[in-house]
């Protein structure tokens, strides 16, 4: 697939007409997965370059709409860190980060809320609508969806929260109505304080609470890479070895650890896919080979799905 900087909207359409037999084979290959996942719940964490490039955004919205149309309950949790930083700059507010986390005072939490709920969330809802889907914007404040407590580093980070509980009632209601909940990761506590929540953590907690079939991270990497190879599957023991050997490093470490905690919480499969590749979501779900890395509970479970 082409990288984001060389992608054009024409890449969302075939350059030439594919042979009818090839089209038929793709559809037949997808059929057992469509049957298998009907009425199942997928939580998708949407972030990275896939949220910035217009053509990638359209591709993602098409993919999500198709998943919903074939009977899969799709729940989106989105980030928006770059958008928050840009909004803050326009308002003359400086963004400060400690160990990759945004320091969030009362002024900054207003920017977070305004940007995630008022801009990023609604843009995603609108784009899905343009492609024939029916989405509803949600924040963790709606129907007590994300209840939070101050994070352990609150003295330094301010209004950055850790998730205490997820109320799934509203999300379930939307899914049963055939809608796609699009969730901005903002939480609250019993005193009415609003918190900035890490989107990966929110997606993980929501997937566990919903007893989801899958949690899918749409990221800026094609999966977990060892040498020149993208791993199709990885188990917990392998991940621990790769972290110890320095093969898995940096920001991938917390994502991998969070993924296995999510597996332990009852979610059946965790996937990391490349948001810079057009239609990677459909290719991961509906083809035998897949295109990303999935986390598995057992080392001998080589099934792509």
UniProtKB/Swiss-Prot annotation:
Family the UniProt entry places it in: Belongs to the acetylglutamate kinase family. ArgB subfamily.
Protein's cellular compartments: Cytoplasm
Gene Ontology CC terms, in alphabetical order: cytoplasm
CDD domains: AAK_NAGK-C
UniProt cross-references to NCBIfam families, sorted A to Z: argB (TIGR00761)
Disulfide bonds: none
Catalytic function, reaction form: N-acetyl-L-glutamate + ATP = N-acetyl-L-glutamyl 5-phosphate + ADP
Highest taxon listed in the record's lineage: Bacteria
Pfam families: AA_kinase
Major localization class: cytoplasm
UniProt name for this protein: Acetylglutamate kinase
Keyword Protein biosynthesis appears in the UniProt entry: no
Residue sites binding substrate per the record: 80-81, 102, 196
Transition state stabilizer (site feature) positions: 45, 255
Entry GO MF terms: acetylglutamate kinase activity; ATP binding
EC number: 2.7.2.8
GO process terms (BP): arginine biosynthetic process via ornithine; L-arginine biosynthetic process
Keywords on record: Amino-acid biosynthesis, Arginine biosynthesis, ATP-binding, Cytoplasm, Kinase, Nucleotide-binding, Transferase
Organism from which the protein derives: Chlorobium luteolum (strain DSM 273 / BCRC 81028 / 2530) (Pelodictyon luteolum)
UniProt entry tagged with the keyword Transmembrane helix: no
